[in-house]
Amino acid sequence: MDYTSYYYYGTENWSFCGESELTSAIDYVVSENLPKVYLLTGHGESSLSDSFTSAVKQQNIETAELSLLTLESVPADTDCILINAPQSDISLDEQSKLLEYLGNGGNLFLITDPPKNEKLSNLEALMADYGVSTVDGIVVESDQSLYVWGTPYFLLPDIASHAITTPLTDGGYRVLLPISQGLTVADDLRDTLSVTKLLTTSSSAFAKAAGYDLTTYEKEEGDVNGPFALAVAISDTVDDGITSDIVWVSSAALVD
């Protein structure tokens, strides 16, 4: 099923044309009229859907693939790096190159799923440097108004007011995120950082430590209490008038 273009015509529209929201996120992290977005490769990243690729082209956004394994640094013409659902971790060398790029005012759009095999430790360490960390497991929602089809991990998160979410809130839409990982924001952010929780669960949500092997929707020992963020926008002031912007969404279904 294509979750990014599914609509429900009832008392409320709870899904949306996902490519519109994603291009809104890219527009947020880049300010150039004709931006160039590099798609990171080398870690089993998922291909972008045809509808999203078409929407990107309509926005005059140029895309190209990028392998940091073979380059000394991020190309100078990079307006944003998109990392889409990597299945394996980045190397420490790649982490260093990404940190250098972001530290100079670069922009990142990160889309992840709960890991199926290996933990993405280096990528998560990079994001922890920007005040956001993951919680192991798959998020299950207890509030019946925030999930669909009787499946508590098919989430309908609350939407915060933000430039990125304007296409949703103006249209009265809800976001459908099947299979998400919880994100938490550090309490002690450095002064240069600002983090906005774009999509959030209720306080009764929890993360099932069993992950993809879960056998019950009930809370068990080892599960972690929410609430969680499922998408965040991060802004880091790296110099006078220069910011590094990052958007992180913790469910790759957004671009399927």
Can you name each region flagged by the protein language model?
Residues 1-256:
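Short, surface-exposed patches at the edges or C-terminal ends of soluble domains, predominantly
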